[in-house]
């Protein structure tokens, strides 16, 4: 497309942005500014979804200053349009450059199409109205952003996302224990912030090894297309922008990239709304010497309004490091470590009070006295009397307990910035059952190990241990490439026997190396014909998806999935409960990550862990250290990496020497230290914080409401009908799944987000959770949103003519059905949609101009109508013109009255909600310094802004249906 600075264009997919102006044309990209909504968009010049706005003679063109002219001549000069015509108020001859056009101009004129004979099919009018209703329903949902992600409805995860995701610029530390889903919580918050417009530009900083995992998680679970940035991508992006970070809205990068000063400076200047930092417990800090990584994140946190830090159990690197992370979130609040420690001493009393309230026993006098002190500004007598009464209603007692508990939570020192759930406080985890299978060391391995010791004497301790743990690699190294260790390794024999004995079980097998995984698949296939598939880092995302889907299939699927260490990162297989660790990693965190593929929230069965090992080898010694020293197979071990760091030298030495006495001493010392650390961590548990983090009964109510929406059959019917109308090919693939493909007969040339080779979808959350290759369709899914946008941003269904066969009415009786959209242009970040989203207003007029909409239900009326062909419809319209013209003016009067009611209702709702939240936070600020001044200021500014936007609410005629009564 030919673009020039100053030209006016509209977005085909986001018409609500108003009239845009080309502000930059660089390389392959064009940037368009939309002043009405204060938005910028960058498009590819080759296929930008934009339409040039050019008025014709006879049209009215409005200036941004408010005056308008009737166009008599259109002049093009230097690729820009100049309109000449008569000023509508003064009658003078005037000119208007296109750059000075009103930014809020709307362009749909259904009545022009109706009188021009451009009449749509009857069902298209219905689908358009339905689409507008669906968009309105989603925009007004109090759970917007929570239903769409392909995640289980886990109460504590949904609660944290609900609480944090609706804040302006949240600054929060997510510190759940392993397996509780911190990444999912972060993804839910990101998804909610994006859908609600609170954030648009997001930077995710993760370790190098987790970049791919985050990319996959965000795409597969949240339908968010992040871009991974490394040095090569930054260099490539220079063709489009001086700052590479401006070329994408959603970016994942590593800390390593930001260690380069130039890249850090560019990231600091990139106007992010939200930053997410994974593995934040690795940010080392001391008051005198903060690490380079810490200083990088600190610099970014000073520029970026919203910050999410994801960390393991907060105190596992020491309490000072925990304070340092809180300091990143709010340096004014957490300014001094000693002051923080002093403040924390007060939390113990609050926690014991909370424990008592959370229970069912009557409160002791000591607890009541504590409550009166802790909630000194409130009169709690009535609440405590209800709790203590022996004849009080149980629900009333629970409500009184909950109210007092909420008051305590609001006053808790870190309750708004720190969320931490532990397995002790969250139900739903399976039991781990550990099984060990000793095997004799094959003679071939003994010989290979002896030769290896002579040949590789130069290796350091870590290298020797690696060899000792993988004798099959040494054997393969010294034998010919055709030699196959799996033909004599007793662990393989045991594996085959196990799979044959458990043919009905899905079995996940994990090995350290991709080569080992491939060899095992070959062994199972060639020796016994066992159906297995592999999953390793050398495969593409699509190949891994297919392997995972083959494993997940209940009928005809693979019995076993064999994963390498890296290949299994970020993938969970809760539908399986049998885990075989063919070898063991030399890292407790990796062991926990392996077990965590199955042992997660949502696992319905006990998890059986099977470890075949070679007797009297490093494999057995390492297995004993994990089992007897850390109890790592049967329990999670948050202190695992601390213990490994403390004992690594003695452990590595004993793995090589195989000295039994030394091993026993290492095991004994590890057990003692493990018990010490476990005790310290248990004492450090903050019960009040856990209550706040998992949400209790409020979280359960939220999840139940989401589950009810999953069962909405009306939505399923509406979406399938939408795809039918658009022309998407739909094929039932069984198991509650549908394959969608573009067809040659689609209403639109492209359907963004629908792949050429199709996509498999389901409306069943459980099905989607068990199959990585199946998308979960909800009202929030991009395929649904895009479908709604395709219909509502086009002229589809804006005009229709129908016949009503009803002999109780005179033949030829006319009804005019008008659908208006009440709307106001505002930046998405203003949150106006919460109070006045685009709202369909229906008017149904008889020939005398009476509005029958309140008395005649749309659905029942629609069912009585019959379609007519376009030729006859056009004749009927022409014959009715004299009656129709005055009815349009009458319809606008009724719609305007409805707009006034909508606006005032929206204003009242906004004032009540925001004033209530402001008063609550102002009251809390007196007792909890964690309430940030920025949040209060934002609420005040938001109320002023929203009142202004509501004053600018307008009506737009969206669709017309002419109905004539016939007796034929």
UniProtKB/Swiss-Prot annotation:
Biological-process GO terms, alphabetical: regulation of DNA-templated transcription
PROSITE patterns: HELICASE_ATP_BIND_1, HELICASE_CTER
DEAH box (motif): residue ranges: 278-281
SUPFAM superfamilies from the UniProt entry: P-loop containing nucleoside triphosphate hydrolases
Occurrences of domain Helicase C-terminal (ranges): 491-645
Gene: rapA
Example of a GO MF term: helicase activity
Organism the protein comes from: Shewanella woodyi (strain ATCC 51908 / MS32)
Keyword Amino-acid biosynthesis: no
Any Pfam family hit: RapA_C
Protein name: RNA polymerase-associated protein RapA
